[in-house]
């Protein structure tokens, strides 16, 4: 079984939490039994999360050797210049080593998304912009660290695709089951 969920902001990518006070988890969304997240989204990130009961599929989605593309819409603080975008395309030096090259483009106009609760802070004197960033790794907070490393801190991060699976019109907290015949990730073009 394969389930696509639009994980809301402020929800952990797991079904339980033992911290005090407990945080919101996937348990509140009425997901089918026996599925688990194939990969993660940070507590403060939103968007597409794939859940499955198929261990081999989960491995193909999460093992970096498979170079599964993951696409994000990223609201950044600042006005990206050509050199910022090129640095992301070339790969960024992080404290745990260089990233693989990424695909990146400006999103103009900004994507029409659901409101976030709490809203992203607005600073009238500081510009912001939206990028579409596609990576083939899945390091901890990788997109946020990449944009910060080139001088563009992330304000909002929404995953919109994993391979050929897209978020489409799923509202936050909504999910849909996909036929298992569709449960094949795309092949990376890199």
Curated annotation (Swiss-Prot):
Its EC number is 5.4.99.20. GO terms for molecular function: 23S rRNA pseudouridine(2457) synthase activity; RNA binding. The active site is at 42 (nucleophile). One of its GO terms (biological process) is rRNA processing. PROSITE patterns: PSI_RSU (PS01149). Keywords: Isomerase, rRNA processing. SUPFAM superfamilies: Pseudouridine synthase (SSF55120). It catalyses: uridine(2457) in 23S rRNA = pseudouridine(2457) in 23S rRNA. Pfam families: PseudoU_synth_2 (PF00849). It comes from the Bacteria. Belongs to the pseudouridine synthase RsuA family. NCBIfam families: pseudouridine synthase (TIGR00093). Responsible for synthesis of pseudouridine from uracil-2457 in 23S ribosomal RNA. This is Ribosomal large subunit pseudouridine synthase E.
